[in-house]
Regions:
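Membrane-interface extramembranous regions
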Residues: 2-139
């Protein structure tokens, strides 16, 4: 049961939950990916194309978010950094630049990865700013 001293902000909760999700996705991706960079459209985790470098990036994002979730200021900072980075990756993916496919196995504008990066980046920025005003009891 949470006490007043263990209350988390929504930004901390977001960072913790999405950090764990990104860690799990990063680990799971190693079971389906066959190449370090590039890759086949058949190397998918559910509907998301992955490769080993992509999985390492997911592990890093997860670790940064979890580390940031420890404090309110850390969560705001990590949510901002991850949000800006993911929106940038989404933009590059939507532009269909070849290096995104060659390096991270992120395909053109119809790729589920681009939409996921856009949504996650927007949520992270929301929780780095306006969405971090109230506190929630720790679970």
């Amino acid at each position: 049961m949470a006490t007043a001293g263990t209350a988390r902000t929504p930004g901390q909760t977001f960072a913790l939950v999405f950090g764990v999700i990104y860690l799990l996705v990063g680990v799971a991706g190693f079971f389906v990916a066959t190449e370090f960079t590039g890759g086949s459209v058949d190397d998918k985790l559910i509907v998301f194309p992955v490769n080993h470098l992509h999985n390492i990036v997911h592990l890093a994002i997860g670790g940064l978010l979890i580390a940031g979730a420890r404090t309110t200021a850390g969560a705001k900072q990590m949510n901002m950094i991850v949000g800006v980075a993911l929106l940038g990756v989404a933009l590059l993916g939507f532009l269909g630049l070849d290096f995104m496919q060659d390096l991270l196995n992120i395909h053109g504008s119809g790729s589920a990865d681009n939409w996921l990066h856009l949504a996650t980046g927007a949520l992270a920025l929301y929780f780095a700013t306006a969405g971090d005003k109230a506190t929630t009891a720790g679970v």
